[in-house]
């Protein structure tokens, strides 16, 4: 498996504390939301991201406002770290008029274009072709922005994800794929859905690098993501020049 070079992107003490703040906020929000669901006060379909906060923070921290994310259904924290307030997000989960979708939806289907957030789709993996389209737009418009596309290891077996990765590799798009491997896809263990050890092993076949990172190590996730983003921006600039 080709591996992404380990870049040392230095973080100040203040930045490390800020990352800790995001980790704690996202976990606390998720825990509170889970309680509200059990109490019957929030009736929307809520998919907990507890235990995956380091992936959200490590990948989103340091993104520019005009960089786009296409989050997974468990990635509520990406909305927070990208700039949506906790109050607005809670209003969204309550389907209130003050939420992102003005009461029309109580999940994460609403996007926030001005913050670089494309709303989640109900079909797992279907966000990746959209991400490829966004990345192609950035390339054609000669912008050095990047797109982050999130999906699970189960969705990695779908045609949508395969086509998006193949398209991104062929056209050298400024797109970073983030696979959140939590071992189980619904009730299906990973060893019964793929013959390889890591989803990242597939990257070489699409013509780009991949790396398997400890998703609970926020600094390792940050370093790997920043390295991938730096190369994606450089690729976009080279293609435009």
Role assignments for model-derived ranges:
Residues 173-174, 236:
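Loop/turn elements at helix/coil->beta-strand transitions in domains of secreted/extracellular proteins
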Residues 31, 35, 41-171, 189-195, ...:
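Cofactor-binding active-site loop characterized by glycine-rich and histidine/acidic residues
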Residues 21-37:
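N-terminal glycine-rich anion-binding loops that anchor highly charged ligand groups
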Residues 18, 28, 163, 220-223:
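Generic recognition of stable, solvent-exposed alpha-helical segments in well-folded globular domains
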Residues 180-240:
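Thiamine diphosphate
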Residues 150, 177-178:
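Residue-level marker for buried hydrophobic side chains located in beta-strands
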Residues 1-16:
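Charged, compositionally biased N-terminal leader segments and the immediate start
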């Amino acid at each position: 498996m080709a591996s992404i070079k380990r870049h040392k992107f230095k973080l100040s003490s203040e930045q490390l504390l800020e990352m800790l703040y995001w980790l704690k906020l996202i976990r606390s929000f998720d825990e509170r939301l889970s309680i509200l669901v059990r109490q019957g006060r929030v009736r929307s379909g809520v998919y907990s991201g507890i235990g995956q906060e380091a992936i959200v923070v490590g990948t989103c921290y340091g993104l520019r406002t005009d960089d786009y994310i296409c989050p997974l259904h468990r990635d509520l924290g990406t909305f927070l770290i990208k700039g949506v307030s906790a109050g607005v997000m809670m209003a969204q989960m309550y389907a209130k008029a003050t939420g992102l979708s003005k009461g029309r939806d109580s999940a994460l289907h609403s996007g926030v274009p001005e913050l670089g957030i494309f709303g989640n789709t109900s079909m797992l993996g279907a966000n990746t072709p959209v991400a490829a389209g966004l990345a192609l737009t950035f390339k054609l418009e000669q912008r050095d922005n990047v797109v982050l596309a999130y999906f699970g290891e189960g969705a990695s077996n779908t045609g949508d994800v395969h086509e998006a990765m193949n398209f991104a590799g062929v056209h050298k798009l400024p797109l970073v794929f983030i696979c959140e491997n939590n071992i189980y896809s619904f009730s299906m263990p990973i060893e019964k859905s793929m013959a390889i050890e890591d989803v990242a092993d597939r990257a070489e076949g699409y013509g780009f690098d991949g790396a398997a990172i400890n998703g609970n190590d926020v600094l390792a996730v940050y370093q790997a993501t920043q390295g991938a983003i730096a190369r994606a921006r450089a690729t976009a600039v080279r293609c435009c020049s």
